[in-house]
Amino acid sequence: MRDILIGGAWPYANGSLHIGHIAALLPADVLARYHRAAGDKVCYVSGSDCHGTPVAIRARQEGKTPEEISSRYHREFAECFRKLGFSYDYYGRTSSEEHKEFVKEFHKKLYESPFVYEKEVPQAYCENCGSFLADRFVTGTCPECGGEARGDQCDACGTVLEAESLENPVCAVCGSEISFRSSRHLFIALGRMEQELKNWVESHENWRKNAQTFSERYIKEGLRDRALTRDLDWGIEVPHAGYENKKIYIWAENVLGYLSSSRAALKDNPEAFRQLWGLDGEKQCEDEKTEIRHYYVHGKDNIPFHTIILPALLIANGDGWRLPDEIISSEYLTLEGKKISTSRNYAVWVKDIVDRYDGDSLRYYLLANGPEKKDADFSWREFVNSHNGELLGAYGNFINRSLVFIQKYLGGTVPEGIPNQELRAETNRLYASVGEQIEKGRFKDALDDIFEFVRKANKYFDSRQPWITRDTDQKDCADTLYNCVQLIAGLAVLLYPFLPFSSERVCGWLQLSPEWKRQQVEPGYRLPEIQVLFQRLDKSWWRKKMKVWKEPVRAEADVAG
C-alpha cells in the first residue's frame, strides 16, 4: 500500500469552467480512481482560487463583493466536477478559514528563512482605476520574444516576467497607461536556490517533456527573485509587522492549497497528513517506510508554478515538505480549430454540457483525444463520432448484446462454461499494463489498449455465433456467453478510472467491486434487468453547434446546448 497525493490545479473563481480546464484536470481523477482500486491510500485534492485581482475586477464589474463572486463560481465549479465524476477527497477554496490559517502559519515560518528579504520595488499603479495592479493585469510587449504578454508571464514564449520588465505597459482592465510607485515588499530569493532546484528538476526524467523543457529553460535563463507580498485589497493578510495594509501575493498562497486541503481532508488523522508530506520520515524505521508519491495535474501554463515556485516555497519554509514527484502537464485544447476565447464567448462551457450529455461521453473524448502530448482540438463532429462509434457501438454494444442474449435465451442466468485461457491471460496482462501506463501518465495509450480489447471481445462474440449454437450446440453457446460475461467484468473494472458512471452500472449488474484485479462472475448468478448503457447521439446536431459560433456573441451564453 502506498500513500498517494494527487493535486489538481485550482481554477480561478472569476468565470465559468470551459472544456479546456477539464481536459487538463481530468487525468487527476483517473489517477485517483486507479490508485484507490489498486489498494493505495489516496488523498485527492483541489479547490477554487478565490483571491487576486481577477476576482476583484469581476466583482467591481457586477457591483458585488469579491466574496460573493468567488462563492458563486466555487459552487458552480463543485457542481460541474460532481457531474463529471471527479472524486475529490476534498475540494476547498483559498478564501476558507482553513486555507488562510494554514498559509499564515506557513508564511510565518517562511519569513524566518534566509531566503526571504525585504526590498523597495516599483509596483504597477493605474491612475484611472485608482488602484495597484497585480502583474497579470498589466499587458505589454514581452522583452524576450516581442509578443504580447501579461505582467506575470508571456504565453507566447513561456517566460515568467515582472510587470516592470514589459515594454509599453498598460492596464489590462481599462487600457490606460500605467505608472510604477515605490512600495516595500517581502521577496523570496529564487536565485540563491537555483542550483538546488536545477539538480532537483534534472533528477526527474519521468516528467512530461513540456515540464522538463520549460523548467530547464527557466533555470537556464536565471531565476529571478519574486515578491511574496502585494498592495492589494482582496487576499490573505501578511503575518508580518508593518505589512498590515498588504496581502500575500496570490502565487505564493494558492499553490499552498495542496497542503491546506490535504490537511483538511485528513483533519481526523494528523499523523497521516505528516506522513503523506514526509514530515515524520525520520521517525520511521527503514523497513516501515511507506512509499509516497505526489502527482500534480495541470495545464502547461501552470508548469513553472509547480516545478519552480511550489518547490522553492517548500524548500525555503524549512520543515522538510516533500517536493513533487510527478508532473502531469497537458498541452492546450482548441475548439473547432480555433483558440478558446472566454472574452468572445468562444468556448464550450462545462455548466452547459454536463446538463445535456453523459459525463462518460466527455470524459472518454477528452482522455482519448485530449492534449496529453501535443495541442488537441475539440470537434463536435468527432465528439459525436467517438460516442456513437466507441462507447455505444463497441463497448455498449458488446455488453448489451451479451447480457440481453443471456436474458432472452438462457433464462437470465450466467451459464456454466469452460474459461478461455487466452482471454483470461490477456485480461490479467491488461491489468498490469494499463496500471503501469496510468501511473506514468499515459492515459491515452491505456484507453486505446482497453478499447482494442473491446474490439477483440466483439470479434469473439461474432466468431462464436451464439445465435446459431443456441440451437445446434448448447454447450458451445454456454461457453461463449460465460466467457463474454467474464470479459464484461474485466472491462468494467479496467474502465472504471476512465468511465466511472457506466462502469458503476455494469459493476452493479454483475455485483463487482472496483478492485484492480480480474474478477469472476460465478455460474448461476441471475442477472437483474439490463438497460441500454449509452444512448445514440444525433449526428445532425453538431451542425447546430457550429452555427452558434458563426453569430456574434458577447457574454457567457448557452453555446453548448
Predicted feature descriptions by range:
Residues 30, 68-79, 105, 394-401, ...:
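A non-catalytic, amphipathic alpha-helix used as a structural packing/dimerization or gating element
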Residues 301-303, 366, 373, 382, ...:
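Active-site-proximal binding-pocket segments
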Residues 209, 393, 441-448, 497, ...:
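Short, solvent-exposed positions on alpha-helices
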Residues 139, 194, 347, 380, ...:
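Residue-level signal for cytosolic alpha-helical hairpin/rod architecture
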Residues 1-200:
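N-terminal, positively charged nucleic-acid-binding surface of large information/translation enzymes
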Residues 2-46, 98-102, 167-408, 448-450, ...:
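Structured secondary-structure scaffolds
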Residues 78-81, 107, 111, 396, ...:
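Structural signal for well-ordered, non-membrane alpha-helices
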Residues 1-3, 43, 47, 119-129, ...:
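Basic, alpha-helical terminal appendages of large translation-related enzymes
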